[in-house]
Amino acid sequence: MPCLALLTTGGTIAGTGAMNRYTAAQLGGQDLLAAVPGLGALADLRIAEVFALDSRDLTPAHWLQLAARIRALINDPSVDGIVITHGTDTLEETAFALHLLLPAHKPVVLTAAMRPSTALSADGPLNLLQAAKVALSPESIGRGV
């Protein structure tokens, strides 16, 4: 079975509360996985909670820390793909920084959510499942972040 690394950084995907009044970065990786029952059947999972922040609070120093963690996973022959949960405010900046900082030979996929995990019709679980499928797809190898 393939191995998928899940790195959590916080954001709305890990937020709790109502849609219009929530607190970002409240849930850890196990909580996020519990909302995606089929994910464990796709891969062996490794979870690392890197940050628990609202993404607007991430800085270039955080990007460097995250890149170092990902680089170690890229160099681990047992890891097939990497998914990072993130907030929407700075997801594209983080993705671009990681794309520039990391080698592209293993899939690295960022995902986020527009609605917190406890909101009606939360979008995070499906986003996480789809990100995992992309990260585990052989077609994603060599395409960067």
Predicted segments with their positions:
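Active-site histidine-anchored catalytic micro-motif
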Residues: 1-145
